[in-house]
């Protein structure tokens, strides 16, 4: 309520993964709500634990995941969700081994982000929401129907990557997805005190000011040392440098500040 009074809408990041230690894992596995493997172990990611993907092509799995988010977030006022990891990002990429409710992964994996977005769109609509928008890391044919705001994912902090975003944004618009953005400054490889990166950030920020969505997001180095490598048996993340507009020196800040106010003047339109 305090944030909303300030004009700020909180967005909660949701991953489509479930740890084998989760209280929900047993039920989801027994009911066939997870992506499975035709051979070997179905663990598809070991980042922050041994995790499995929920099967976004399965209507029952969609309903189950939404019910958890409704109970833990929606009922407390959250109305917008950030659907990360929506490719999904397998490790390893053995697409001939994974199987969905909709069929073998080789036939239907690209539809995963469509089902992921539909899960939240249908849930929010059934809850009575009429203005729905979900931030999603990728999209596919059909995503247009489910109120997606797509961004281009974990891209490099290079001028080449910035140039590629112009192409990507034009393609998304022609595909019927008007809400699109990229991580201003790129996501990977930006060093806060590197003059070359600061130049890239300024140019990207100037362009980003006129994109459909204006968003800074990314890992900024150098990284801090971990206080603990593991807690229990889960490897801990560390934190990078600040990514606020004032994190890159006074000269850069004055330029970014200028374009922040340009964007604010444009916002009513």
Model-derived features: where do they sit?
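Catalytic-domain carbohydrate-binding cleft regions of carbohydrate-active enzymes
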Residues: 1-269
């Amino acid at each position: 309520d305090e944030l909303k009074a300030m004009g700020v809408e909180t967005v909660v990041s949701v991953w489509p993964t479930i740890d084998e230690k989760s209280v929900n894992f047993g039920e989801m596995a027994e009911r066939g709500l997870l992506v499975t493997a035709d051979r070997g172990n179905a663990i598809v990611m070991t980042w922050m634990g041994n995790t499995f993907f929920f099967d976004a092509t399965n209507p029952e799995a969609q309903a189950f995941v939404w019910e958890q988010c409704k109970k833990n977030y929606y009922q407390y006022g959250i109305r917008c969700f950030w659907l990360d990891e929506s490719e999904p990002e397998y490790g390893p990429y053995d697409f001939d081994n994974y199987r969905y409710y909709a069929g073998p992964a080789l036939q239907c994996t690209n539809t995963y982000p469509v089902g992921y977005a539909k899960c939240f769109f249908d849930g929010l609509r059934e809850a009575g929401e009429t203005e729905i928008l979900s931030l999603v890391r990728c999209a596919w044919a059909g995503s247009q129907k489910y109120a997606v705001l797509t961004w281009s994912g974990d891209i490099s902090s290079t001028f080449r990557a910035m140039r590629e975003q112009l192409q990507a944004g034009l393609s998304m618009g022609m595909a019927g997805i008007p809400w699109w953005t990229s991580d201003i400054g790129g996501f990977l490889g930006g060093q806060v005190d590197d003059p070359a990166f600061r130049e890239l950030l300024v140019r990207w920020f100037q362009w980003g000011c006129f994109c459909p969505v204006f968003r800074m997001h990314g890992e900024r180095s150098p990284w801090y040392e971990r206080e603990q490598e593991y807690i229990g048996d889960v490897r801990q993340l560390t934190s990078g440098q600040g990514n606020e507009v004032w994190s890159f020196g006074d000269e850069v800040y004055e330029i970014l500040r200028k374009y922040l106010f340009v964007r604010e003047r444009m916002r009513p339109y």
